[in-house]
Amino acid sequence: MEHENLETLIATLGTLDHHGVDWPRVQWTAYLIHQHLRYDYPGPIHDLHQRLMIVPPERHGGQRLVTRKLEIAIPGQPPEQVPTPQESRDEFGNLVLSFSATEIARSIDFVAWIVVERDTASDPAIISAHTFFNPAFSEPSALTQPDDALRAAAAALAVGDAAPEALAARINAWVHAQLTYEHGITGVRTTAAEALALQRGVCQDYAHIMLAICRLCGLPARYVSGHLLGEGGSHAWVEVLAPRPNGDGYVALPFDPTHGNRPGLNYITVATGR
């Protein structure tokens, strides 16, 4: 979905200091996401293949994609000669932009402009029965394999007959209390068990621990990647998949164990996965 006059739309949005916003009273907001990704290489690169997952879904609960634009610049190449990315969907329905180039001399720039709207009137993101029963969201992944400590935590947290949302909230609060946020301690291959043992980590570690415990407690759950206003870079949180209270279908309920809260209007979902 490309907007013919993105510049005009951007000009109407305006800016504000999010620290001064009384978020509980906000019912609707629009966001401009500007991302500039630059890749530098020590020398010429041949047969480059790049995959980008930066475009939010068309709809996700109260979030709606309004418009998007991607510019690609390769020094030394006229814009009309830069290849156009191919669009596809991965197994979870996320939009993937695939870019290929025969040769890159030194660098390549990807610049994205994305506008999304969010409101509080909409229900949580509705999911299909196929998604709810997908084993990918109920069984451990490589990064969420449980150990004895995670199993013990799940057993303690699952005491009682809590509804899925209440149990998820209990797990969310517990994970938040167990870790201290700290950069440089963990990496992209750090497992939930390792992060819990360290009791330190970043948002992806909080999310992996919550995913592991939710699945041990019988709650299907998935990883969410997106943006949190004021964080600067990307952020990760969790969606717990549950039947709707009226029994009509299924929804994805968001939780952010890093901050110990429920994501609101200041969160933007980009992609979901295991």
Positions of predicted regions on the chain:
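Linear, non-domain "peripheral" regions
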Residues: 1-152, 218-219
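Short alpha-helix boundary/capping motifs
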Residues: 37, 65, 199, 203, ...
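Residue-level preference for alpha-helix termini and adjacent loops
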Residues: 40, 44, 51-53, 98, ...
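Generic structural "secondary-structure junction" signal
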Residues: 43, 47, 54, 72, ...
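Short capping/connector residues at structural and topological boundaries
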Residues: 46, 50, 142, 186, ...
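Secondary-structure boundary elements
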Residues: 116-120, 124-201, 209
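Hydrophobic/aromatic-rich core segments of domains that either
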Residues: 173, 205-274
